[in-house]
Every structure is written in structure tokens, then in C-alpha cells.
Amino acid sequence: MEVDINGESRSTLTTLPFPGAEANSPGKAEAEKPRCSSTPCSPMRRTVSGYQILHMDSNYLVGFTTGEELLKLAQKCTGGEESKAEAMPSLRSKQLDAGLARSSRLYKTRSRYYQPYEIPAVNGRRRRRMPSSGDKCTKSLPYEPYKALHGPLPLCLLKGKRAHSKSLDYLNLDKMIKEPADTEVLQYQLQHLTLRGDRVFARNNT
């Protein structure tokens, strides 16, 4: 059966049978007996407009496949790789489950350790700020969860509250604006800034 990948015949995509779903469903139904048939963690397969629910675990985390992925798997299955196609969905659902559970666990650790605290704002509204990884409460973490969610944090965030409070105070910016620009003063401040940065980096590495 030829189906357009661009999604023109979406109805045929949704009714496309998932390879291995029939083979896996009786075994899974015996393995995970739901408490009652109306529970969302029962191993019922449902099709939602181009998406098919592969697996839904007790934390209501759902693994989806798109219609294009189903189409590719169906083409693989007709190509004579039926055993591989039967092994693929369970493997993909396990990977999706592991990834989703890992992200939820990471969020739990973040919400446990990264308690937001208040910053007084200039315009009267109170902002909430997440403490950076340099604070004491995150020292007990065996791994660094911020690296999994985004790239390496900038130095001012890594150094904690001290870098926020002292980053611009020692430069005396208001005096620099009032006084005429003196090259010696600026050069001294620039040297002081680079030396201070080197010292911070050296202390970080050791």
C-alpha cells in the first residue's frame, strides 16, 4: 500500500496497523494487569490522529510514534524484516519510557534542591530566582543536573551570590561616568578585572 508521507491521506496513516502491536499486546496484558479496565495505565492501544500510543506507564508518561514512523516501520516489515520490526517497538517504548522517567526524576531533583527565593525588584514586583549551582544546597548532588538540560552555565551563575553582588561594584561605574575618561584609570581597572578573573579560574580548577 502506497501512502503519501506529506500527510495528504492522513486517515490511512491512522488506521495503519502497528507491526508488533498485536504480537506484544497479549504478553503485555498478562505482565501488567491493570487494577480495573478504566485505569489509564491499562495496555490498550489507541490511535490519535496520526500518532499511536505505544505505552503508558503508571506515571501517565506516554510514548508516541508519528504516522511517518509507523509508515517506515510498515515498509520495513513488508521488506521481510518482521522479527526486527517486532523487536523495535518494545525497544523504542522502553527508551522513551527511560528518557521520560529520567527527565521527570531530574525535574524532581531540581525542584527539591533548587528552591526559588525572592529578589526585591526595582519596580516593586517581586521576582523569583533559582539559586545557581554554586550554592551550598547543590553540593550534595552526585551529578550535575544542569548539564543535562542545557549547556554549561556562565561563570557568574556558577560562582553563586558573591559574583552577583561583587561583579560590578568594585568598578565604580558611577564615578567613571561622572569623571572624564582617564586612560591610566581605565587601564588599571582593566588589569584588575583580568587578574581577578584569572584568580577565579585558578580557584575553580583547584
From Swiss-Prot:
One of its GO terms (biological process) is inflammatory response. Belongs to the UNC119-binding protein family. The modification N-acetylmethionine is found at residue 1. This is Macrophage immunometabolism regulator. InterPro entries: UNC119-bd. It comes from Homo sapiens. It comes from the Eukaryota. Its main location: cytoplasm. PANTHER family: MACROPHAGE IMMUNOMETABOLISM REGULATOR, UNC119-BINDING PROTEIN C5ORF30. Residues 1-41 are annotated as: Disordered. Phosphorylated. Keywords: Acetylation, Cell projection, Cilium, Cilium biogenesis/degradation, Cytoplasm, Inflammatory response, Phosphoprotein, Protein transport, Transport. It holds the Pfam family UNC119_bdg. It is found in: Cytoplasm; Cell projection, Cilium. Induction: Up-regulated by hypoxia in cultured rheumatoid arthritis synovial fibroblasts. Down-regulated by TNF in cultured rheumatoid arthritis synovial fibroblasts. Down-regulated by the inflammatory mediators LPS and TNF in primary monocyte-derived macrophages via a c-Jun N-terminal kinase mediated mechanism. The modification Phosphoserine is found at residues 25, 140, 167. Interacts with UNC119 and UNC119B; interaction preferentially takes place when UNC119 and UNC119B are unliganded with myristoylated proteins. Regulates the macrophage function, by enhancing the resolution of inflammation and wound repair functions mediated by M2 macrophages. The regulation of macrophage function is, due at least in part, to its ability to inhibit glycolysis. May also play a role in trafficking of proteins via its interaction with UNC119 and UNC119B cargo adapters: may help the release of UNC119 and UNC119B cargo or the recycling of UNC119 and UNC119B. May play a role in ciliary membrane localization via its interaction with UNC119B and protein transport into photoreceptor cells. GO terms for cellular component: ciliary transition zone; cytoplasm.
